[in-house]
């Protein structure tokens, strides 16, 4: 089993030894409740770096709904066993007081890319993400950090953060891992009922159908409206957004030209699912 480190001091001591030996360090930031998507990130890090740290921290600052924070699954023993199978070198699993000690007063906010989509529906969420990620980069002194493309907006926020603050870490975006029926892997999926789980792939299927329609010449607003209707018809309670944007997310696309990203968030069984695909 990989050692589970609880304090920044323990982590820094270990990383200092690795750096002194000239070894490269990769980090995979997670909130635990690990699944094959997370493990694929750890394997990618394992292949690219001499040493791999997986962080497990349920970050209270990125939950704008306290009930969601309480419901978030915490499965550390199971997570550690999964990470042992991948061969990570250390798990960093601090408590909230270690990450945000008494007197902590700094908030990192990335303008622009953090504002639409998730930012509009979850105020403050990306401030919490940016703050904890900046701290984790400082704590781990990582050379490379691995993030899933499933959270595309988060990936764009982290890239902007690193570029703007000259943080010396390379951000690696890794392809979304999906179930056989197309559903993007997510820790939230375990909260779906059996019926909800069967309905859930309708989200990505509607997105794929819209993509094909737009590539075939259908007007973007019409294709998106049909996709939204299909998601609701499949049993989803709400669709927060279903938008075509430039890959950097800064601008909505009214017509299909250049690289775009189709992004969606919808609620099923009271569980909010997000997904995105390239267009």
Curated annotation (Swiss-Prot):
Molecular function per GO: ATP binding; pantoate-beta-alanine ligase activity
Residues the record lists as binding ATP: 31-38, 148-151, 177, 185-188
EC number from the UniProt entry: 6.3.2.1
Family matches, as Pfam families: Pantoate_ligase
Keywords: ATP-binding, Cytoplasm, Ligase, Nucleotide-binding, Pantothenate biosynthesis
InterPro entries named in the record: Cyt_trans-like, Pantoate_ligase, Pantoate_ligase_C, Rossmann-like_a/b/a_fold
Active site, per annotation: 38 (proton donor)
Pathway(s) served: Cofactor biosynthesis; (R)-pantothenate biosynthesis; (R)-pantothenate from (R)-pantoate and beta-alanine: step 1/1
Catalytic function, reaction form: (R)-pantoate + beta-alanine + ATP = (R)-pantothenate + AMP + diphosphate + H(+)
Subcellular location: Cytoplasm
GO-annotated biological processes: pantothenate biosynthetic process
GO cellular component terms, semicolon-separated: cytosol
Main location: cytoplasm
Presence of keyword NAD: no
Residues the record lists as binding (R)-pantoate: 62, 154
Residues given in the record as beta-alanine binding sites: 62
Subunit structure of this chain's protein: Homodimer.
Record's miscellaneous remark: The reaction proceeds by a bi uni uni bi ping pong mechanism.
Recorded family membership: Belongs to the pantothenate synthetase family.
Function: Catalyzes the condensation of pantoate with beta-alanine in an ATP-dependent reaction via a pantoyl-adenylate intermediate.
Name of protein: Pantothenate synthetase
Native species: Cereibacter sphaeroides (strain ATCC 17029 / ATH 2.4.9) (Rhodobacter sphaeroides)
């Amino acid at each position: 089993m990989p050692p589970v480190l609880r304090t920044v001091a323990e982590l820094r001591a270990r990383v200092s030894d690795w750096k002194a030996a000239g070894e490269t360090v990769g980090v995979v930031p997670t909130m635990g409740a690990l699944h094959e998507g997370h493990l694929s990130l750890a394997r990618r890090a394992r292949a690219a770096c001499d040493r791999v740290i997986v962080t497990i921290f349920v970050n209270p600052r990125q939950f704008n709904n306290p009930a969601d924070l309480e419901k978030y699954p915490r499965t550390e023993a199971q997570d550690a066993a999964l990470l042992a199978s991948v061969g990570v070198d250390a798990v960093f699993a601090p408590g909230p007081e270690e990450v945000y000690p008494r007197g902590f007063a700094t908030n990192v906010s990335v303008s622009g890319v953090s504002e639409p989509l998730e930012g509009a529906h979850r105020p403050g969420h990306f401030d919490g993400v940016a703050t904890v990620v900046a701290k984790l980069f400082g704590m781990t002194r990582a050379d490379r950090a691995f993030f899933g493309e499933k959270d595309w907006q988060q990936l764009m926020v982290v890239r902007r953060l690193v570029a703007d603050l000259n943080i010396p870490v390379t951000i690696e975006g890794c392809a979304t891992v999906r179930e056989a029926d197309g559903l993007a892997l997510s820790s939230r999926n375990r909260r779906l009922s059996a019926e909800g789980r069967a309905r859930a792939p309708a989200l990505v299927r509607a997105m794929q159908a819209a993509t094909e329609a737009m590539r075939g010449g259908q007007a973007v607003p019409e294709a998106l409206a049909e996709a939204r209707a299909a998601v609701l018809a499949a049993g989803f309670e709400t669709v927060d957004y279903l938008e075509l944007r430039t890959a950097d997310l800064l601008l909505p696309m009214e017509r299909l030209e250049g690289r775009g990203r189709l992004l969606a968030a919808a609620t099923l069984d009271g569980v909010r699912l997000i997904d995105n695909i390239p267009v």
